[in-house]
Amino acid sequence: MSERIFVTGGCGVNGSWVVRDLLERGFEVSSFDHSSDTSLMPDLRGAFELLVGDIRDGALVSRLVHQRKPAAIVHLAALVGYPQGRPDPKLVYDVNLGGTLNVLEAAIVGDVPRVVFTSSKSAYGVVTGAHARPTYQPVPETHVGLPAPASFLSMYGHAKVAGEGLGFNYCAAFGIDFFALRFATICAPGKLARHGPMSVHSRLIENGMLGVPTTFGQGGDERDDIVYVRDVAQAIGRAVTTSHRGAEIYNVGQGRPFGLKDMATAIQRRFPGAVCNVGPGYDFMKVGFGAYNVLDISKAGAQLGYAPQYDLDAMVGDYVAALERFGITPMAS
């Protein structure tokens, strides 16, 4: 009988690919999500167990985990924006931090030896010195940035850092393995529909597919690390299966700087008529602070065997193929 992995947020933009990767690795998967929407994984319906519930319900999470006795928990469930379009710090922290605490408690109750936590580049806050623009020296896991200005992004980052701290302390107290993966900016099919126009690379690709011009008034000089969702899933799968033990943080990205114009060029190779206009300067997402960086991925390479498989051209090609395969209509934005 195959080992089972318990995945929170398994119907999401990233989680759907994690479920797919784990199934391909031969695991059985229980996916726990607040929604039963499997539109990003129509090819997998019936191939995994779908559980619907609220990550804030610690008793429910613990009961489901205890019943299934998984070999590991992969925790992706999180809010990635304000659900009602207005600031709600309590909700953000209840879900993004309280949910992590519930998962760790469930691991102890269910005697689960390993938790893989999806963290983020936002854990670095505002990177400084040579790691910042214009040099973009790759950021190691040991780097401590400046606190980001108050915003959803700063709350998201705070919860990720605090979640990492919880995991390290649970590892020390109970001996479970805890691996936190800090992802670069993720490009994924379905992200535009689920997460909105802040999904700038999805905007570029889907507008290119539709022949709709995309214009950014600023940001042509900005660089950022971009990772494709299949590489995200690959890294998580490696963290689930590694023989490494203890508590660790790993950066996951391509480890190289890219600009919007680089992505536009890759899209134009696929769709020669695609038009993308990018003005000069920095901060194409207009977040107001240095949220852009390049990650040092050498530790993940050395300890997990991680190596990115999708450059920009492969990213665009697979993104388009996935939309077509899953019957997802591209959106103009």
Show where each model-derived region lies:
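N-terminal Rossmann NAD(P)H-binding glycine-rich loop of SDR-like oxidoreductase domains
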Residues: 5-25
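NAD(P)-dependent short-chain dehydrogenase/reductase
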Residues: 11, 129-138, 168-223, 229-234, ...
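Rossmann-fold cofactor-recognition segment
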Residues: 45-56
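Active-site Tyr-X1-5-Lys
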Residues: 142, 149-179
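Conserved Rossmann-fold NAD(P)-dependent oxidoreductase catalytic core, especially the SDR/UDP-sugar
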Residues: 101-155
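C-terminal substrate-binding subdomain of Rossmann-fold SDR/epimerase-dehydratase oxidoreductases
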Residues: 212, 216-333
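NAD(P)H-binding glycine-rich loop region in Rossmannoid oxidoreductase-like domains
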Residues: 55-95
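Conserved internal alpha-helix in NAD(P)-dependent oxidoreductase domains
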Residues: 71, 90, 94-101, 109, ...
